[in-house]
């Protein structure tokens, strides 16, 4: 469709610009919006690799609810939707997006995607970075490792957000 072609041209332009700014280095994009575009992205960029870092829904959904609540507060011209509506929409959206994503990832060759539990990655990021490079058949891990170590060291005091899922939603 026309809208899809427009999106592809715009997205391609952004990626080319980012690649130019980064002197042609391979891009790593962290974009939750791309979770629902996996198949489209793979068709546009057949050599693309996907890292699916997933969380338990009880951790994911409260974060999504928080994001939507903030967006409603910041951008809503009328009275924001009641919290129950935001909760229902968040749960439904997460379920639909991740069902689709899981199906699309399962259709790919193993060397084109990797699934990693967020909690496992946080426990041993260096091991999982190595595993990502191996499974996706990426080159340059040895050269990148010192940069990973420096970055991970800089994040030691990072405090994660902790949102709780209310019992009535479970």
Tell where the protein language model's regions lie, with residue ranges:
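Short His-Asn-centered micro-motif
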Residues: 28-32, 118
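Conserved phosphate-donor/acceptor-positioning beta-strand/loop module used by diverse small-molecule
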Residues: 30-31, 41-66
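Loop/turn-to-beta-strand initiation segments
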Residues: 23-26, 49
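Extended, H/D-rich, highly charged conserved domains that either
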Residues: 1-7, 31, 38
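PAPS-dependent sulfotransferases, especially Golgi type II membrane carbohydrate sulfotransferases
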Residues: 2-9, 15, 19-22, 65-170
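Short, well-ordered alpha-helical microsegments
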Residues: 35-39, 125
């Amino acid at each position: 469709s026309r809208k899809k072609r427009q999106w592809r041209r715009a997205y391609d332009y952004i990626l080319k610009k980012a690649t130019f700014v980064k002197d042609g280095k391979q891009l790593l994009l962290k974009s939750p919006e791309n979770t629902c575009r996996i198949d489209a992205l793979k068709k546009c960029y057949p050599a693309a690799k996907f890292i699916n870092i997933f969380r338990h829904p009880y951790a994911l959904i409260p974060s999504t609810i928080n994001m939507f609540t903030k967006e409603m507060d910041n951008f809503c011209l009328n009275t924001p939707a009641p919290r129950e509506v935001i909760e229902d929409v968040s749960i439904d959206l997460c379920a639909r997006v991740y069902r689709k994503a899981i199906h699309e990832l399962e259709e790919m060759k193993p060397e084109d995607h990797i699934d990693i539990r967020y909690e496992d990655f946080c426990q041993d990021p260096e091991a999982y970075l190595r595993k990502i490079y191996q499974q996706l058949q990426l080159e340059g891990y040895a050269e990148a490792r010192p940069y990973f170590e420096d970055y991970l060291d800089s994040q030691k005091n990072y405090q994660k957000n902790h949102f709780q899922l209310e019992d009535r939603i479970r």
